[in-house]
Amino acid sequence: DIYNVAKYENIFGANFNFKINLGAVKKYVAVDANDFYFPLKEAAAAVVNQNIKGTIFKDLSGNFEDVDYLIFTPPFLINQAETLANFHRTNSGLTVRVVTLENIYQEFSSGKQDIAAIRNLVKYVYWNASSPDKRVKYVNLFGDASYDYKKRITNNNNIVPVFHGFDPADSENNNNANISLYSSFMSDDFFGLMDDGEGTMTGSFDGIDIAVGRMLVST
């Protein structure tokens, strides 16, 4: 019934015929019932309640406090990251927050690995400080990085992802510029670009706004 999309009838047999009116270009798609793709269910489908945006600026008493230092870590390194955070709280007088990558992805990129999610959290903390002089100053990427995001190589160390870039001038004459050993590069400066319109990391861009470092730990 062409007037009722909820009413349909399966057609069986080797041949199928139908009539159409001429006068307009139309597209028809035939689908083999044996060739359907079914969505895969995530192994860890349950999502724990969290609210990074609502808690990142809260101290233990629930009062607002500006953040000086952000540490991003995978869950299996969180104890070591907290040890480092406590060192700087005690000896450097810094307000430090440790956030796991999984929680960042869950809140800023629908649960999927995305370097933009990490940068967007930094940007949220940066622009929501109580005053410009109280903005976050340091970011620590607590984990090794790899050029292989998809973990296809053996003994891969893609723990905290890194920005991949290439020279756009080279891409005009080279379709493989993104994998060129000459024009492609990796950089953590991406996570410190806080101004609107920044983040492309082309051949010319403004300086970073935050000190960004990485500890190449894997165990």
Name what the model sees in each region.
Residues E82-V96:
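Well-ordered, non-transmembrane segments within structured domains
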Residues L94-E107:
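A generic structural motif
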